[in-house]
């Protein structure tokens, strides 16, 4: 059986699992893991086929979620960034008893643009898939550059993301393609209407991949959830605004503890 790479840090009284985005790995959290591990028992995970979780091919969203769950604590706050937000959401839908709260970061339940739904144009995602076959390192770098565009620290943030990618062997092309296929096809807008645990959605005002127009639409569709927009962030608010980001998670932890004690 293939193993998921998993690292646990800290001894907080609430578990927090962090799931990274497409093309990346758990090293992306190093900018905040020290701070978070002083408040939580922190779980850093490389998604199947990414980073140190080798030996996996392209997986469906459901299979990716099940693979990650195998090594997870019984109960935790699940936080997913971008593609990781879909994985965390899938776990909240299929195993709600194991999710104390769901946090999605710069993530959309439907990344692909649809009728009356803002998102990434399907032909752009298909283009990325095609380009992966031609020059996959350059394609990944282009995708990373898109994630930080427009912020005051764009160049520095893009360098941080690139360093994360290059720190470990690149994922296989079929794994990257599989991740893009999930972004292109999955739509969890309706299913997530039914989750009952605390649900926090974090966005960057300048995000070029998850348009801010989706925020009020999802506020209306999911009135039980809360949203927060980082005014000067793009697709990676935890890199550009680490202090503010951690503060929101610590505040969520306090709410989760109140709920679990009542």
Curated annotation (Swiss-Prot):
Name the GO terms of the biological process aspect: biotin biosynthetic process
Listed under GO cellular component are: cytoplasm
Pathway field = Cofactor biosynthesis; biotin biosynthesis
Disulfide-bonded cysteine pairs: these are none
Q: What is its EC number?
A: 3.1.1.85
This protein's UniProt keywords = Biotin biosynthesis, Cytoplasm, Hydrolase, Serine esterase
Catalytic residues, per the record, are 82 (nucleophile), 207, 235
Q: What InterPro entries does this protein's entry cite?
A: AB_hydrolase_1, AB_hydrolase_fold, BioH, Carboxylesterase_BioH
List localization entries. Answer: Cytoplasm
- The keyword Lipoprotein appears for this protein: no
Can you state which reaction this protein catalyses? 6-carboxyhexanoyl-[ACP] methyl ester + H2O = 6-carboxyhexanoyl-[ACP] + methanol + H(+)
State a single Gene Ontology molecular function.
pimelyl-[acyl-carrier protein] methyl ester esterase activity
Which protein family is named in the record?
Belongs to the AB hydrolase superfamily. Carboxylesterase BioH family.
Provide the function of this protein: The physiological role of BioH is to remove the methyl group introduced by BioC when the pimeloyl moiety is complete. It allows to synthesize pimeloyl-ACP via the fatty acid synthetic pathway through the hydrolysis of the ester bonds of pimeloyl-ACP esters.
How does it associate, per the subunit comment? Monomer.
Protein name listed in UniProt: Pimeloyl-[acyl-carrier protein] methyl ester esterase
Q: What is the lineage of its organism?
A: Bacteria, Pseudomonadati, Pseudomonadota, Gammaproteobacteria, Enterobacterales
Q: Which gene encodes it?
A: bioH
């Amino acid at each position: 059986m293939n193993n998921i790479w998993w690292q646990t840090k800290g001894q907080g009284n609430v578990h927090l699992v962090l799931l990274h985005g497409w093309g990346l790995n758990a090293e992306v959290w190093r900018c905040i893991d020290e701070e978070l591990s002083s408040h939580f028992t922190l779980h850093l995970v490389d998604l199947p086929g990414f980073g140190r979780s080798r030996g996996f091919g392209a997986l469906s969203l459901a299979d990716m979620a099940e693979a990650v769950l195998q090594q997870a604590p019984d109960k935790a706050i699940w936080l997913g960034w971008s593609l990781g937000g879909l994985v965390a959401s899938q776990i909240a839908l299929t195993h709600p008893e194991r999710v104390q709260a769901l946090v999605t970061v710069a993530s959309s339940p439907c990344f692909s643009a649809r009728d009356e739904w803002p998102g990434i144009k399907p032909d752009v995602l298909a283009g990325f898939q095609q380009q992966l076959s031609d020059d996959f390192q350059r394609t990944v770098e282009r995708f990373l550059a898109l994630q930080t565009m427009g912020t005051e620290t764009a160049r520095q943030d893009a360098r941080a993301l690139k360093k994360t990618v290059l720190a470990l062997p690149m994922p296989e092309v079929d794994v990257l393609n599989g991740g893009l296929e999930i972004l292109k096809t999955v739509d969890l807008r309706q299913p997530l209407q039914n989750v009952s645990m605390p649900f926090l959605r974090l966005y960057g005002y300048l995000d070029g991949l998850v348009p801010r127009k989706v925020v009020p639409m999802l506020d209306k569709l999911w009135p039980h959830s809360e949203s927060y927009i980082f005014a000067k962030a793009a697709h990676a608010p935890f890199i550009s605004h680490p202090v503010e980001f951690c503060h929101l998670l610590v505040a969520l932890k306090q709410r989760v503890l109140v709920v679990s004690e009542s």
